[in-house]
Regions:
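Positively charged, helix-rich recognition surfaces that bind polyanionic ligands
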Residues: 3-171
Length: 171
């Protein structure tokens, strides 16, 4: 692949990872809460709390939304092409953010870590449940990439010999 005058060679590979994870071998337990104001808040067995601020992420997403809104109101052919480009750019950027955060967590705690996440399956951000929030807040909640972060953390943890456990959000 040629990009900006440089050539890159992509080599796909498969790594066999042991599916078995024994609770007897747990060295660390890390609870992770996902959110918008703070992308993640983690709490480990030593009582150390780590916050990853979502402020810069939120600003950049607002910028993408503003540009998207302006282009949609124009409605020209070139505006539609630009919208397609921006959409891909925002998705790639958000994927990279999730990748970096999950990679940092997994490398920080090493093998034998049990990451505990709240199970957001079935959680709905419908208008009924969101109440009297602004349209901006509703849109932000609906488009946040909670699941993608969970997927990134899960596969990276398993590759390193750790595990992700999902619990009910009530606890």
């Amino acid at each position: 692949v040629s990009m900006n005058g440089n050539w890159y060679f992509h080599i796909p590979m498969t790594k066999n990872v042991s599916e078995e994870f024994s609770m007897d071998h747990v060295k660390h337990v890390v609870g992770i809460d996902r959110g918008i104001r703070f992308m993640i808040t983690s709490y480990d067995e030593k009582g150390k709390v780590t916050f990853v601020s979502g402020k810069e992420i939120q600003k950049k997403r607002e910028h993408f939304q503003q540009v998207r809104s302006e282009l949609q109101s124009k409605g020209t052919k070139s505006a539609k092409r630009a919208l397609k480009r921006i959409s891909g750019r925002e998705n790639r950027w958000m994927s990279d953010v999730n990748h970096q955060i999950s990679k940092t967590l997994v490398t920080k705690y090493k093998a034998g870590t049990l990451f505990v996440l709240e199970d957001l399956k079935g959680v709905s951000f419908s208008d009924d449940l969101l109440g009297k929030r602004s349209a901006k807040d509703r849109q932000e909640l609906r488009t946040w990439t909670f699941y993608q972060f969970e997927q990134d953390l899960t596969y990276k943890a398993q590759a390193l010999g750790s595990q992700v456990l999902k619990v009910k959000p009530d606890y």
